[in-house]
């Protein structure tokens, strides 16, 4: 059994779409940076799936691959950021300047998602070393939450790449569902501990994984909202104040 079943293609360290050696118009360069960001996001998403699967398979080769890909993601983070800094020095239309500003934030969020995949692999190593296992229900719960997180991540990346706000409300709804799912799973895991149905160590790792997945969803939401050049938490706070004043 595995927790995620999407294809896990190979990845390469070298950037595919951006290069300071090839001259292109600034607007084309911005589009290429977006394509490189999409590639980096696919790497991070695939690596998260790979890492989650190692919780079940304990496959050391796959765990090693998670760490290798994380290095690639960090490499791309630096390369794209440097490229954007270089682009920012050109004379650009306001729309491109805003797009570059948003890309800085998006690339950082993707890098943070990559960090969570590495944390999951660390948990798989800990579970292997300490002979810790989850119940079948625990595995199912993680798999279902992972599916929700992948959905919001896919939609957010697509939204940003297309610069399309059409599905923003759907992103907000999925994010709210994931927040509720995290609360429900944390409560269920406390109940399992109380009934002695799982060990304290398994419970602690499970709790960390659920919290980590919720934070991945937060980063995905940030990516969607970056189109507006607005932080989702700041927006929620502003709307709450506006609602209270009505």
Descriptions of predicted regions:
Residues 5-246:
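Cytosolic, long alpha-helical scaffolding segments
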């Amino acid at each position: 059994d595995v927790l995620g079943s999407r294809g896990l293609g190979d990845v390469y360290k070298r950037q595919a779409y951006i290069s300071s050696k090839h001259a292109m118009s600034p607007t084309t360069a911005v589009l290429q940076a977006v394509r490189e960001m999409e590639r980096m996001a696919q790497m991070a998403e695939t690596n998260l799936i790979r890492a989650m699967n190692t919780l079940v398979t304990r496959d050391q080769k796959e765990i090693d691959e998670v760490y290798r890909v994380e290095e690639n993601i960090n490499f791309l983070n630096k390369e794209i950021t440097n490229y954007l800094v270089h682009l920012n020095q050109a004379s650009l239309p306001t729309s491109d300047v805003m797009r570059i500003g948003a890309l800085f934030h998006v690339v950082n969020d993707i890098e943070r998602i990559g960090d969570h995949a590495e944390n999951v692999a660390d948990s798989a190593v800990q579970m292997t070393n300490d002979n810790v296992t989850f119940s079948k229900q625990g595995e199912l719960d993680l798999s279902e939450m992972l599916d929700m997180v992948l959905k919001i991540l896919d939609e957010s990346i697509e939204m940003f790449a297309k610069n399309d706000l059409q599905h923003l409300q759907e992103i907000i709804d999925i994010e709210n569902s994931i927040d509720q799912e995290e609360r429900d799973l944390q409560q269920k895991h406390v109940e399992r501990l109380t009934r002695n149905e799982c060990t304290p160590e398994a419970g602690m790792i499970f709790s960390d994984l659920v919290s980590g997945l919720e934070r991945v969803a937060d980063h995905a939401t940030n990516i969607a909202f970056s189109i507006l050049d607005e932080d989702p938490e700041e927006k929620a706070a502003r709307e709450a104040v506006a609602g209270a004043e009505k």
